[in-house]
């Protein structure tokens, strides 16, 4: 039986981008089927009475610094050396999420994902 993984993502999230970059190796290693589900993370934060980490942990000593260390560890562990934070972070991803939903409905979400990456240094996308 094929394992199925629902991967909820927002193009604005650097963590979602980095996780996306390792999904193919997880798929190959486990045989899992990855179901990409575009979401608006800002809407989820609002709905659940939460804030983005940059806001939530502002002023919490060393919290953001530790998150950056963990991100660097993940990047090194998975060989994602080309990753760069978008210089316009945080970005509003509403339009490209709408595009992802439309692409998913028309059956070409995978192709759309390969073309649209806010954090992809070779394809700068300014929103």
Where are the regions that the model predicts?
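Single conserved hydrophobic/aromatic residue that forms the stacking wall/gate
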Residues: 117-127
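Short glycine-/acidic-enriched loop or helix-start segments at secondary-structure transitions
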Residues: 17, 46, 127
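A generic structural signal for solvent-exposed, polar alpha-helical segments
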Residues: 14-15, 23, 80, 123
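Aromatic- and histidine-enriched alpha-helix N-cap/loop-to-helix transition segments
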Residues: 11, 90-94, 123
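Local sequence-structure signature of Cys/Sec-based thiol-disulfide redox active-site neighborhoods
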Residues: 2-19
